[in-house]
Amino acid sequence: MSILPAVGQDEQVPHYVRQPGVAGKITSVGSDTLANLMTFWSQEFKTLYPHVGFQIQASGSSTAPPALIEGTATIGPMSRALKPSEIRDFTRVHGYPPVVLKVAMDAIAIFVERRNPLPGLTLKQVDGIFSQTQYCGGNGYINHWSQLGLSEESYQGPIRLYGRNSVSGTYGLFKIMALCDGDFKNTVNEQPGSASVVLSVASSIGAIGYAAYGYKTAGVRALPLGETADNFIPLNSDTVRGEQYPFSRFLYLVVNKKPGEPLPTLEREFLRYVLSKEGQQQVVRDGYFPIREDVLIRQRRLLAQ
């Protein structure tokens, strides 16, 4: 039985309908997590509109707000919500806040090498593994696999930690969600992208790392998580879209839209495409999860305000 709320028949997600006179260039600056998805969207959009060009710079979510403030980007992909300070900085310059659209769902996964027999982790264990400060109630540092009950010879050594760098939205959100805004251990090997984290974990039987689930490969396994070992929650479409999985999150596109005025035609049509059946099919293609229909309809309404 589905755990997702239904949407009224008059509010079904529409197909995208091609419009005349769409041309120009979209500049995207922001999230590495959304880099592949932005590429998929741009490629499909260009098949509809051959005279549209894209420039995509994916250096991390923290680069999106300054680029939108300065006008060097038309769209800012982000894997986390805007901080209050980022909204204030934008509003100070433009006189109104940016429009933030939810465009996909993802989860920050805890990956281990695919043969690792660990059944799952409690949230306190996650804190003990990754955090120096353990603000989430970790019961002491967990530095060796034996502390998690693994007795196999392959897991007699220390746990090797992998994660993202500080400019990443994934880093910032995991810090809040998993570490209760505590500090990471200095033994976390920081990587420039989620793909690098997954590759590192897949290449090392004693490794564990956090990364965007959309970058999962056959070489890794995403661990179930829970408050206790008796209620581990697997990472799948239902638990992410229903927000039961502890580290579920939305992915966003942020734009500069003046209240009461329409976006320029090119930006408006690209966002309408993203928030259509065809755009959400690309979300699935990239390994992420489409947003619920009720959420998507609300995002389309934001474009009309």
Question: Which residue ranges define each predicted feature?
Answer:
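Flexible loop/hinge segments at secondary-structure junctions
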Residues: 4-305
